[in-house]
UniProtKB/Swiss-Prot annotation:
It comes from Arabidopsis thaliana. This is Transcription factor MYB7. GO terms for molecular function: DNA-binding transcription factor activity; transcription cis-regulatory region binding. Interacts with SAD2. Keywords: DNA-binding, Nucleus, Repeat, Repressor, Transcription, Transcription regulation. It is found in: Nucleus.
Amino acid sequence: MGRSPCCEKEHMNKGAWTKEEDERLVSYIKSHGEGCWRSLPRAAGLLRCGKSCRLRWINYLRPDLKRGNFTHDEDELIIKLHSLLGNKWSLIAARLPGRTDNEIKNYWNTHIKRKLLSKGIDPATHRGINEAKISDLKKTKDQIVKDVSFVTKFEETDKSGDQKQNKYIRNGLVCKEERVVVEEKIGPDLNLELRISPPWQNQREISTCTASRFYMENDMECSSETVKCQTENSSSISYSSIDISSSNVGYDFLGLKTRILDFRSLEMK
């Protein structure tokens, strides 16, 4: 449930205040004090809203209000207070006797802000504009380095389970190691000789190759590793490996180095 309105809006005067209304308001407050602004208009014989009476008194009719332009000392004090308090105009006005928060806010937006910008000072941070940009850039860079430092090695497996990726941190950069498993089933050669011999035993040879390579992720090249192959049959298991650090190096359309590995060049033992 919201707050009830301060007065009925029907049969209320709106717009500029007349001299007679100002005199009634000043006379009543001098005699009875400010009191409750809700009941004050009716007691003073004014067809005005309580909020309108309060703003009229605070901003225009108070006897301690200062008239005229802001002085140089007031300008310096407003700038100093704004650097400490920000846009809290009521707190700033409390430290400038005779000035209202609305008056100070309008003066800030129309005069002081332009004055600071002409001197190359950011009105929001009260620092040099170039200095603020450099500081923001440094914060962004520090945040990126901080995010990278928290990266740990983890392993990702795709849906088929044949491809795995490991991430490492090398010299502050993220490198990815990709492992591709290639499995090849090799059956026996077809024997076309017709002769009587014992039944052929169903032997199957399986070759599995795992290629590990590092590729670039942060505009720097990461080192490559080796390819390991394993050949299995019913009688024995053999292993072979090849170094791909000297494999073909190419460039993609972005100018990034890529390494090409031809699995056909591997010799299965």
